[in-house]
């Protein structure tokens, strides 16, 4: 992939831009040394790399607004960055750009168990949202494979899901509202703390937009009570087609598993070689997980 040519006029103004950024951010939050900006040259898609001109790490919504106003004034491209775990290259900068990382914005701002809502800064990691409410037996449902490290900002940008999206949906199904900063620095709030907020469904546009419409700084998320228990079952098949038909039959039987994972023979062999899990000799596997009370689990297992 050929990277776009940088704007030489912007590069010539680097010192002026850094000076302006230092008026609104502490020194440690402005990274302009080429040896240090190299850390932001890519996300988890490491095949493509390009160090940014500058990286900034604001810690408040107002600081994000101030940064974007400066960049807007100087016509500097801005690339928002969560935790850099994406494999899609969404946080790949250009040589004349400013990377705006939200990693320092990781606080829990409000928790409302009665209404099953939590408000967090967007740099908070996915798994730590559940960690913040687990003592009250709640959890945050979307669970991408990188949930230990990925940021809520990135989850919103990519509309991330995970193994349990079959029952609980992806980020857009669990996002109630955001505070975000438009590219000219204007701060806006969209949605709210309730499932049905008034107005147009702008959240549906924001979620999955890969940061192109603005920088999300706060997110209001739905939290759910933890189920009493969960149990997986592994089913072997002699063909991929039969496994696929079984998925439809499970749903038709009135069972909504919390997760269904499909593995074909090549994947089974690779996983067995690595994990030595004792997978059976077969053409396809389904790993189906159900949850609920012990009675509910047994009933679902019987129907499966």
Regions found by a protein language model. Give the residues of each.
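Noncatalytic alpha-helical scaffold of FAD-dependent oxidoreductases
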Residues: 1-304
